């Protein structure tokens, strides 16, 4: 990753990374340190990951244990540090869990994004970057739908903000991140059976360095309101990934290690998309980074209030039905 274009935007700046103890957030923190950020504030509710990054990176990193769902606490933190740049990576991301607890996807992912974005604007941050996912495109999962709501909220903020530039980045599946398929396959190989949902299921893949490159470099070309996507090439069959991981471990697929097909889970797609049909990807000065204009829906604020009402009543079925309608209209 060539960081020379990014350094002037980061050097001597106060940067905040929500979810900074996670696999993506921690790599953002490491890169910010190399780019000579003045201070890096990790906001994370999970202390172990944040502690590890703090020990590795050193005094430049400050850790605040807090939930992005706690407005008063986040307000205190924002007021204390006055970040120039906010990278919002904190989120619930596991599709099956969010199908079981859709109200938590709304409270954490959507309301959490709203709170952090509002506070970034309140304290005059220069940039706010949302970490989103390709599962937000034509979502069939609650998790994907919640991230689509986040994209729309950030776009709505960009239309009204006088100072802060609001943008988003869409990730594919990030290799070797927490909960991703390759570490799972490696563990399953030890037991002699690897599970794949469907023989034809495909996903777009990117590495952790590519994910961080997208986050940092897109910020240098953001005007506000855009969504940036890394050109990951074609989608890859998960079955091919499983077979390769088995072979790389010195074993023979279907002989030394069985592969079982478990069926798509609720919320799983057979194939993901990087863009909605109405979005028109445009090239940027960075060869591998594409840009689309953000978008929203009519009466978004009113719809969001109705969604929150259902979420805070813990109406799981109501949340699921409403958020799917809201993000596929």
What positions do the PLM features span?
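Conserved Rossmann-fold NAD(P)-dependent oxidoreductase catalytic core, especially the SDR/UDP-sugar
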Residues: 82, 88, 92-151, 156, ...
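N-terminal hydrophobic signal-anchor/signal peptide
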Residues: 1-14, 39, 76
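Conserved Rossmann-fold cofactor-binding substructure of NAD(P)-dependent oxidoreductases
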Residues: 65-85, 267
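N-terminal Rossmann NAD(P)H-binding glycine-rich loop of SDR-like oxidoreductase domains
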Residues: 14-35
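Conserved residues in the N-terminal Rossmann fold of short-chain dehydrogenase/reductase
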Residues: 64-65, 107, 261
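Conserved beta-strand scaffold in the Rossmann-like NAD(H)/NADP(H)-binding core
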Residues: 63, 130, 168-170
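Helix N-cap at the beta1-alpha1 junction of Rossmann-like dinucleotide-binding domains, i.e.
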Residues: 44-49, 234
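Strand-loop microenvironment adjacent to phosphate/nucleotide-handling motifs in alpha/beta enzyme folds
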Residues: 5-9, 122, 154-329
